[in-house]
């Protein structure tokens, strides 16, 4: 779950971790191989009745644009050719196919994506957005996943990490994510309130750099969105593992302008992906099998 970044550089990263992260990043994000093993592109044929719902101007243009801010694997990141890939890109591409459109991901600073959607220079935002009440004042969201925070630890750690007893630990996070703002920092404050040693928080610009800190032993744990922690563990060559259950669950969604004519068409396309099983297949290719939806939701509400 992502919120606009604070416009300053990471202060926790040292020269050593930055240098080493280049050699370990491919283990964590799979950048060299790009898509997961066995991945195949799923682009359904257009569905005429859904295609007819697409606003005329977009139908004539023929290309659906989506703003993304990599890296945030497995949601969006760049492969070795510099192409933006990830589960959100696959989902939006499939939705576009159902609507008879091509798909064009557009890299943009995270803080500028929603304003660009609102201004009409992007059709949608697809960059790990949490669907919450504050954002719904200006945007509608087609939800695609319910996910929460989950911690990870080194697999060779003798004493398992317990997030409920984390005082005195060093925890790596991606800056301004819910894992930092709503989980680790409040936990640390509670430690201090109880007279215990606070949590040392290492905040990084990207999730893969935070995971690298855990791999290098600079952190005792990683706290991140559950799919992010699971992806990092899967790509770590057995060096880290998720621990405990996820919590603070919330919906992830694609952002649309408020009351946009495109939203009903895109929601119908997403429902088609669910009905045909393409949604489940796309998610499974990225190792996401929990928190899936049974029906399309706009702002957590069913279409009918």
Swiss-Prot record:
Q: Which residues form the signal peptide?
A: 1-26
Q: What Gene Ontology cellular-component terms does the record carry?
A: plasma membrane
Keyword vocabulary terms for this entry:
Amino-acid transport, Cell membrane, Lipoprotein, Membrane, Palmitate, Signal, Transport
Covalent lipid attachment of type S-diacylglycerol cysteine occurs at 27
Q: What is its main location?
A: membrane
Give the membrane topology.
Lipid-anchor
Q: Which PROSITE patterns match?
A: PROKAR_LIPOPROTEIN (PS51257)
Q: Where is the protein localized?
A: Cell membrane
Q: Give one Pfam hit by family name.
A: SBP_bac_3
Question: Assembly and partners?
Answer: The complex is probably composed of two ATP-binding proteins (ArgV), two transmembrane proteins (ArgU) and a solute-binding protein (ArgT).
- Name the chain's protein: Arginine-binding protein ArgT
Origin species: Corynebacterium glutamicum (strain ATCC 13032 / DSM 20300 / JCM 1318 / BCRC 11384 / CCUG 27702 / LMG 3730 / NBRC 12168 / NCIMB 10025 / NRRL B-2784 / 534)
Organism phylogeny:
Bacteria, Bacillati, Actinomycetota, Actinomycetes, Mycobacteriales
């Amino acid at each position: 779950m992502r919120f606009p970044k604070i416009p300053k550089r990471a202060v926790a990263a040292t020269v050593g971790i930055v240098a080493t992260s280049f050699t370990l990043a491919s283990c964590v994000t799979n950048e060299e191989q790009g898509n997961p093993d066995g991945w195949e592109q799923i682009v359904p044929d257009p569905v005429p009745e859904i295609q007819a719902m697409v606003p005329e101007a977009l139908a004539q243009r023929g290309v659906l644009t989506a703003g993304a801010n990599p890296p945030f694997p497995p949601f969006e990141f760049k492969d070795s050719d510099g192409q933006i890939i990830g589960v959100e890109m696959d989902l939006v591409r499939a939705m576009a196919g159902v609507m008879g459109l091509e798909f064009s991901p557009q890299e943009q600073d995270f803080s500028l994506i929603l304003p660009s959607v609102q201004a009409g220079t992007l059709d949608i935002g697809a960059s790990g957005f949490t669907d919450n009440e504050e954002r719904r004042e200006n945007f509608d969201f087609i939800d695609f996943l319910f996910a929460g925070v989950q911690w990870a630890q080194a697999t060779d750690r003798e004493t398992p990490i317990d997030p409920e007893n984390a005082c005195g630990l060093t925890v790596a996070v991606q800056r301004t994510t819910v894992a930092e703002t709503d989980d680790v920092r409040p936990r640390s404050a509670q430690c201090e309130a109880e007279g215990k040693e606070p949590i040392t928080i290492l905040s990084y610009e990207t999730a893969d750099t935070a995971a690298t800190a855990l791999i290098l032993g600079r952190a005792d744990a990683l706290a991140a969105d559950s799919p992010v922690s699971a992806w990092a563990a899967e790509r770590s060559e057995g060096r880290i593992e998720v621990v405990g259950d996820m919590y603070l669950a919330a919906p992830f969604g694609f952002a649309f302008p408020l009351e946009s004519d495109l939203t009903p068409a895109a929601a119908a396309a997403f429902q088609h992906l669910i009905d045909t099983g393409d949604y489940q297949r796309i998610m499974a290719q990225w190792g996401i099998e929990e928190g899936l939806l049974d029906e399309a939701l706009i702002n957590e509400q069913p279409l009918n």
